[in-house]
Amino acid sequence: MSSHGLTKSLVVTALALVGAWAFAQAPAQEQALTRSAEDPQLQWGPCPPLMPAGCALAVLHGDPAKANADAFLKLPAGASVPDHWHTSAERMVLVAGELQANYKGQAQLELKPGMYAYGPAKLPHSASCISSVPCVLFIAFESAVDVVPTEPGR
């Protein structure tokens, strides 16, 4: 084999090894997904004690103890959530029902299905499901999920 042929073979082999090493170092590709509130595979769990009876949460993506978790929050028809706040900002879309939200010092928000709402971090708020059907709210949290009551002991 000529020195040119040997050099070419070594370069191709080196590139293949570098490519294989880079691929092995890359994190696993996340899978795309879709979810609906009626998905039977959703695992609904209880809400924190502050929330009303019948409230349920389903984690859609991520880990609620870490940044960037997404969840569905389900409130029974007529249920109200007392004043509380979150360390994280919330980005929300109402999926079902009609919901009123009251953020301290701001005009009342009324959400219908498909409407987006933004809740600033640490801003106290309350909410009520004002429809005759349960309210389902998609929430994207920027940081770990928490619910802090504004009244101590709640």
Where are these regions (language model features)?
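Bacterial N-terminal signal peptides that target proteins for export
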Residues: M1-V12
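Conserved short histidine dyad/triad with adjacent acidic residue
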Residues: A69-H86, P120-K122
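Short beta-strand His + acidic residue motifs that chelate non-heme Fe in jelly-roll/DSBH
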Residues: V81-D83, A101-N102, G119, P124-I130
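Short acidic-glycine-tyrosine-enriched beta hairpin
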Residues: G105-K122
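Bacterial N-terminal signal peptides
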Residues: V11-A20
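A short, N-terminal "cap"/entry segment at the start of jelly-roll beta-barrel domains
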Residues: A22-A69, P152-R154
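Glycine- and acidic-residue-biased ligand/ion/polar-headgroup-sensing regions
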Residues: P76-A79, H86-G105
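Double-stranded beta-helix
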Residues: L33-S36, S126-R154
